[in-house]
Curated annotation (Swiss-Prot):
Protein's name according to its UniProt entry: tRNA-specific 2-thiouridylase MnmA
Domain of life: Bacteria
CDD domains: MnmA_TRMU-like
Annotated Pfam families: tRNA_Me_trans (PF03054), tRNA_Me_trans_C (PF20258), tRNA_Me_trans_M (PF20259)
Chain spans, region Interaction with tRNA: 148-150, 316-317
Any one GO molecular function term: ATP binding
Stored InterPro entries: MnmA-like, MnmA-like_C, MnmA-like_central, MnmA-like_central_sf, Rossmann-like_a/b/a_fold
Coiled coil: none
Organism, as annotated: Acidovorax ebreus (strain TPSY) (Diaphorobacter sp. (strain TPSY))
Disulfide bonds: C100-C198
Gene from which this protein is expressed: mnmA
């Protein structure tokens, strides 16, 4: 195995810690970098960056590597957070983790690592990279642990980025990662996984978004046009949402709806022109199901779109691959047709294409059709 100078993104979590350990065990020259990418709430109870850095520094000490603290807050706010807000203001539901990976972890961080003389970078993502011997192209593969696979969030990476990237824990299951961490005495072996917005942390989302986006309350209507209540602003809702609608006590009587007295309500549409939130009763309501989507701002790992034909796709993280047909893929736009109806396909989220375990790339969902 060729030995490299590898810069590892140490987040303070167990996955990146084991990543650094494995690389050092393989004989690589390993340096750690802790990225601070959000500083608006440094004194907030929800900001964990101080503790995360202390955890990362403790890990570096146990493993025996140097660690550097680097601030990418300006880049994050300009390249990721500004787009995140624009999408919400346009009534869509963005996925900041996808953009953060493409713009910060595998661009700003990669560039910084190269300036430090790195030959490779590594992160604790559950994914894999291989070079196809027939084409010479680098491929992004799903992580071996299906419950932790993060290729969905990495689908915007390109050939240059993948050629410089290592994902050591992509060949492991999470239980193995925690066992390794415990065996070598890492102080964060039992630290829980983070689940908040990329780099912003775990905080009440509506309260957080309210600080940055103007909101206009409006009516909540059902599929018949009946008024059920008022929403607090369309930006605060996403398609398929069930909790937090404030209409839990409004139940439709009668069997004619086919949903029953106590069937839950789901967000089905956001009508920006009239500032109206549309909700429907029942998980399988036709308004929640679609067979086709159109996507834009596509990025293809091989550098070109896949040919029209049979494929598989995810329209949300952790979703099982859904069989589909690529109807057209030209430039940065493509369309998919699904033989089985997909539930709550959401504009702003990513549609990511797969050929078996190989991630082909994807784009941002722009429109859906029944």
């Amino acid at each position: 195995m060729t030995k490299h100078r590898v810069v590892v993104g140490l987040s303070g979590g167990v996955d990146s810690a084991v990543t650094a350990h494995l690389l050092k065990q393989q004989g690589h020259e390993v340096v750690g970098i802790f990225m601070k990418n959000w500083e608006d709430d440094d004194d907030s109870e929800f900001c964990s960056s101080r503790q995360d850095f202390l955890d990362a520094a403790s890990v570096a000490d146990v493993i025996g590597i140097e660690i550097e603290h680097v601030n990418f807050a300006a880049e994050y706010k300009d390249r990721v957070f500004a787009e995140f807000l624009r999408e919400y203001q346009a009534g869509r539901t963005p996925n900041p983790d996808v953009l953060c990976n493409a713009e910060i972890k595998f661009k700003a961080f990669l560039d910084h690592a190269m300036r430090l003389g790195a030959e490779k970078i590594a992160t604790g993502h559950y994914a894999r990279v291989r070079q196809n011997p027939a084409t010479g192209l680098f491929e992004l593969l799903k992580g071996l642990d299906p419950s932790k696979d993060q290729s969905y969030f990495l689908h915007r990476l390109n050939q240059a980025q993948l050629s410089k990237t290592l994902f050591p824990v992509g060949d492991l299951h999470k239980t193995e990662v925690r066992r390794i961490a415990a065996d070598i005495g890492l102080p964060n072996a039992k630290k829980k996984d983070s689940t908040g917005i990329c780099f912003i942390g775990e905080r009440p989302f509506r309260e957080f978004l309210n600080r940055y986006i103007q909101h206009a309350p409006g009516p909540i209507l059902d599929d018949r046009g009946r008024k059920l209540g008022r929403h607090v602003g369309l930006s605060f809702y996403t398609l398929g949402q069930r909790q937090g609608l404030g209409i839990g006590g409004v139940k439709e009587k009668g069997a004619q709806r086919g949903a029953g007295d106590h069937a839950p309500w789901f967000v089905a549409r956001k009508e920006l022109e009239t500032n109206t939130l549309r909700v429907v009763q029942g998980h399988e309501h036709p308004w929640l199901l679609s067979h086709r989507l159109d996507a834009q701002d596509a990025s293809w790992i091989a550098g070109h779109p896949p040919a029209a034909g049979a494929c598989a796709a995810k329209t949300r993280y952790r979703q099982q691959d859904a069989a589909c047909t690529v109807l057209a893929a030209q430039g940065d736009a493509f369309s998919l047709q699904f033989p089985e109806a997909q539930w709550a396909v959401t504009p702003g989220q990513s549609a990511v294409l797969y050929d078996g375990e190989v991630c082909l790339g994807g784009g941002v969902i722009a429109a859906v059709n029944g």
